[in-house]
Amino acid sequence: MLTHLDSQGRANMVDVTDKAVTSREAVAEAFVRMLPTTLQMIVSGGHPKGDVFAVARIAGIQAAKKTSDLIPLCHPLMLTSIKVHLAAEGDDAVRITASCKLAGQTGVEMEALTAASVAALTIYDMCKAVDRGMVIESVRLLEKLGGKSGHFIADQAQVSS
């Protein structure tokens, strides 16, 4: 069942008024593939625009907080934790993981996915002058905890909470 559609098939925001406040958490990831020389420039701190990872981290945090402004049917949430981690993966990629938490009536999957996506876009923006062939890939939800639908772990069967 698509929860964002009413009985006539019109888009609407889900009413969470009567849902219990519970602890909720989500973790998402994204990868940015690039030339090895581009990754080396980022890791060594040699980028003329500054610390690429620091800027991407802040962009991801800001994006999580702005998710409801970007995705029309997302509820505005009072997130209590946002963490964005960036690390070199092999010699040609950056792996981004983003986690979001709150005590609330709806999940934080979209906030975590938005954080990872915007951090990846920020890396692309900062490095496009030296590597226009970068690829943002594998944006996905890794884990979701809390709420009625239970515990989800990517690549595993759904686990109830």
From Swiss-Prot:
Coiled coil (residue ranges): none
Pathway listed: Cofactor biosynthesis; molybdopterin biosynthesis
Active-site residue numbers: D125
The protein's Enzyme Commission number: 4.6.1.17
PANTHER family listed in its UniProt record: CYCLIC PYRANOPTERIN MONOPHOSPHATE SYNTHASE, MOLYBDOPTERIN COFACTOR SYNTHESIS PROTEIN A
Assembly and interaction partners: Homohexamer; trimer of dimers.
Identification of the protein by name: Cyclic pyranopterin monophosphate synthase
